[in-house]
Design a protein with these regions (language model features):
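Short, small-residue-biased leader/transition segments that mark boundaries at the very start
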Residues: 1-7
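Mature extracytoplasmic or organellar-lumen-exposed domains after removal of signal/transit peptides
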Residues: 11-198
Length: 198
């Protein structure tokens, strides 16, 4: 395991050893409110009844679902309508550059060296474009499947387990594209630019 993954695994093992809850699924964390001892505590203190706790959990699951839905829709839109078109445009510029290098230096031995980096970039960009497009499609299908579920808890768990993981995976490919695509063409503020906004 690498760095943070090892740290997370160690923390989970330590929490389990101490008898602490180490659940990291948000929808499942809300189940703690419906444990018998928690219900009893809320009843005895007169704060909330069991029905009120159940209602609050339903609201929390619904809020979680809505947040992941919105984030998935926005990321899908940004990916397909803003990031991919810019990456394709930049890739086309690189391909034009490769064609002009071949036209000018095609018969000379230095052509391979001169065109190696643009060709490598074109391949990498193409890989990221394909991955983002495929993952956005898969994420949309996972959302459609989760939306057919009527029970809010089960639906929230489905969103956590099948939709939310795509957010990080897609973002990782977009982060890589951000480092490759020409700064002038990139449609969104880059991380380094956000650091210096006043």
């Amino acid at each position: 395991l690498v760095g943070s993954e090892m740290c997370i695994r160690d923390r989970k093992e330590e929490a389990a050893r101490r008898g602490l809850d180490c659940e990291n699924s948000v929808p499942l964390q809300y189940d703690a409110y419906l444990k018998p001892e928690v219900i009893r505590m809320f009843k005895e203190t007169g704060v909330l009844s069991e029905k009120e706790l159940e209602a609050r959990n339903e609201v929390k699951w619904e809020i979680y679902i809505k947040k992941v839905q919105i984030e998935a829709r926005v990321l899908g839109d940004l990916s397909l309508n803003h990031i991919i078109p810019v990456a394709v445009r930049y890739q086309s510029l690189l391909l034009d550059n490769i064609a002009k290098l071949k036209e000018t230096f095609g018969g000379y031995p230095e052509y391979d060296d001169m065109s190696e980096e643009p060709r490598r970039l074109v391949r990498k960009i193409a890989g990221h474009i394909c991955s983002v497009t495929r993952m956005v499609d898969e994420m949309v299908e996972a959302r459609k499947k989760a939306n057919r579920i009527t029970d809010l808890r089960t639906k929230a768990i489905a969103y956590h387990d099948t939709v939310a993981p795509y957010l990080d995976e897609i973002r990782s490919h977009i982060d890589d594209l951000e480092l490759m695509v020409d700064n002038q063409m990139w449609p969104l503020p880059k991380y380094r630019e956000l650091l210096f906004i006043r």
